[in-house]
Amino acid sequence: MVQLRPRASRAPASAEAMVDEGQLASEEEEAEHGLLLGQPSSGAAAEPLEEDEEGDDEFDDEAPEELTFASAQAEAREEERRVRETVRRDKTLLKEKRKRREELFIEQKKRKLLPDTILEKLTTASQTNIKKSPGKVKEVNLQKKNEDCEKGNDSKKVKVQKVQSVSQNKSYLAVRLKDQDLRDSRQQAAQAFIHNSLYGPGTNRTTVNKFLSLANKRLPVKRAAVQFLNNAWGIQKKQNAKRFKRRWMVRKMKTKK
């Protein structure tokens, strides 16, 4: 703090007064310097700093304000109300978005539909067709049938002409079935001769099927045959089974009589 000093008189002062004034000025400068640096100074300047420190200690020692149950309950209710309002706002926003989407969807459907003029034309045309008399409808049906018959006759004529042209162009030959059987028998005899000459008793050759069947027979664990050597075995067994069945049926019928 800066102390105010009394105004000096205009009368000439003594030497002692001048010395006291110099000491006071030096003390005031020291006090100001101490205030700026935050250090206590000597004399009256140190007293206010001590008072400020005591005030800070009192402020630190003060306890926090106590909250009552009613105030805490009011704050909790206020918080719940805020949360409910936010949820309600979110729901309203979602509803508005859905409504907008539905409106846009309806507008797009309307754009895709045909214009009203074309729809009216189609409805009028269908009504006029329904209003026609049954006599006219029968006449139209008869005309269509006649046209179809004429087209069918024309197509039949074209087919007959094609058949005649084919028969005239191509020549057919008659062949007896006996000659065909002789040809088949000759082919079989030729195949048998080739087989005997290649795989006969005087040759050291065997077919693949025979070789595999012999290898399978020599194995300790028998496997399924790759291919049957004689295809007539199954046919003969079937024929024998049929004969046995017939005989058994005849014997049974005789015993019943």
Curated annotation (Swiss-Prot):
InterPro entries registered for this protein in UniProt: NOL7_C (IPR012579)
Keyword flag Coiled coil: yes
Segments for region (Disordered): 1-94
Coiled-coil regions listed: 65-104
Protein location: Nucleus, Nucleolus
GO molecular function: RNA binding
Family membership noted in the UniProt record: Belongs to the UTP16 family.
Protein name: U3 small nucleolar RNA-associated protein NOL7
Organism encoding this protein: Homo sapiens
Recorded name of the encoding gene: NOL7
